[in-house]
Regions:
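Active-site activation/catalytic loop segments of kinase-like enzymes and analogous catalytic loops
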Residues: 50-84, 99-116
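Active-site beta-strand-loop-beta-strand hairpin of nuclease catalytic cores
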Residues: 32-36
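Activation of the activation-loop gatekeeper triad in protein kinase-fold domains
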Residues: 39-44
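ATP/Mg2+ or Mg2+-diphosphate-binding catalytic cores
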Residues: 104-138
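An alpha-helical support segment within catalytic cores of ATP-dependent transferases
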Residues: 1-21, 84
């Protein structure tokens, strides 16, 4: 229900295009701080660019269960050096982030509780659910 309400609150006219959709550390090969390759393009789709940005932050911007503002600031600065966010995108960031966290939690629940239960990953969705109550740097 919350995802449906969030989807309604996120403007439909945010700038869109082809996005990766799954930029997490395990999908990036790097060396000495340089990105050498991106992997796992099975989630590629046409979606808002800001959704890809916050999804990347979900993957890279948290440490020990807390958001790391410096990582958000670096990610945003790098992103905006190429394409500045619109005012509407900036305003939508909290809802986009919440939507992305819920989507990851739902996927992890399906994958590790329903599809392949009983592994060491069974409670990985809980990590995402705990993020919903944290204060974000945007």
């Amino acid at each position: 229900e919350e995802m449906r309400l969030l989807k309604q609150s996120i403007p439909e006219d945010l700038p869109c295009g082809i996005i990766h959709g799954d930029l997490y550390p395990d999908n990036v090969i790097g060396k000495s701080g340089e990105v050498l390759a991106l992997l796992d393009f099975e989630e590629i789709c046409i979606e808002s660019f800001a959704m890809d940005l916050v999804t990347t932050y979900v993957g890279f911007g948290w440490k020990d269960g807390l958001p790391v503002p410096e990582l958000w600031n670096a990610l945003l600065a790098g992103y905006e050096s190429v394409r500045p966010l619109t005012d509407a995108e900036h305003a939508a960031l909290p809802d986009l982030h919440r939507f992305a966290v819920l989507a990851v939690a739902a996927w992890r629940y399906w994958q590790f509780v329903i599809h392949v239960p009983g592994t060491e990953h069974t409670n990985r969705y809980v990590e995402m659910m705990k993020r919903l109550d944290k204060t974000l740097p945007f």
